[in-house]
Design a protein with these regions (language model features):
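Arg/Lys-rich, often Gly-containing low-complexity segments of ribosomal proteins
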Residues: 182
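Catalytic center-proximal scaffold of phosphoryl-transfer enzymes
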Residues: 1-164, 168, 175, 187-212
Length: 212
């Protein structure tokens, strides 16, 4: 199996800048386990889809509807406010919904716990906890989650740096997104120079001529 592109880039930059300390953007750390948990959820949903009983179909719909809640930070789940939810045919809290969903499948619960642990270490900058968790022997995780943790072990130093320092490529990502919006709203640019000038104008790097 080929190594992830992120690992390849890290090896390349380490060779080009041997004295530099690499830092992986925290967004990409969370994205890895986010996708792994989503894949585990969908895998379990497919199992329920093949079942013929009514309960399995109802649980399938719950897993489909509450996918965002499954990805929500556990510490932000509301456990006191009861609201009516049609799929539960009654009032239930966010915490109650998650507890029910996790009770359906042990593998999903284990993947959920792994996801939440990584999210917690990133959110609260806990490099020691992160390092300890990725080196623990984890049982019952999906292949995708196992691969994510393996990637973390390969990139351990760069991730620990990310949890120890405030550096981020968020500014660069913001610029890239704005450039994409400029291109989309203009329905593309045939002339690269015009496209470049439009970007410079947006960022006030180029003066515009006004009619006399």
């Amino acid at each position: 199996r080929s190594r992830p592109w992120l690992w390849t880039c890290m090896v390349l930059f380490q060779a080009l800048f041997p004295q530099a300390e690499l830092i992986i953007d925290r967004f990409h750390i969370v994205t890895q386990v986010n996708r792994a948990l989503n894949r585990a959820r969908i895998g379990f949903m497919n199992t329920l889809k093949k079942a013929n009983d009514l309960k399995a179909k109802r649980d399938y719909r719950k897993l489909k509807k509450y996918w965002k809640l499954i990805l929500k930070k556990e510490e932000l789940l509301n456990g006191t406010e009861y609201r009516y939810h049609r799929l539960f045919k009654g009032t239930v809290t966010e915490r109650g919904i998650i507890d029910y969903i996790l009770s359906l499948d042990e593998s999903l619960r284990l993947n959920y716990n792994a996801y939440q642990t990584i999210v917690f270490t990133v959110t609260h900058r806990k490099p020691d906890l992160f390092r300890s968790f990725i080196h623990e022997k984890q049982q019952g995780l999906s292949a995708k989650m196992d691969q994510a943790l393996k990637t973390f072990r390969q990139s351990e130093r760069a991730i620990v740096n990310a949890l120890s320092y405030d550096y981020s490529n968020g500014l660069v990502e913001g610029i890239n997104n704005k450039i994409k919006v400029i291109k989309r709203t203009a329905y593309g640019y045939r002339n690269f120079s015009n496209f470049r000038n439009r970007i410079f104008i947006e960022y006030k790097l180029l003066e515009t001529k006004t009619a006399a």
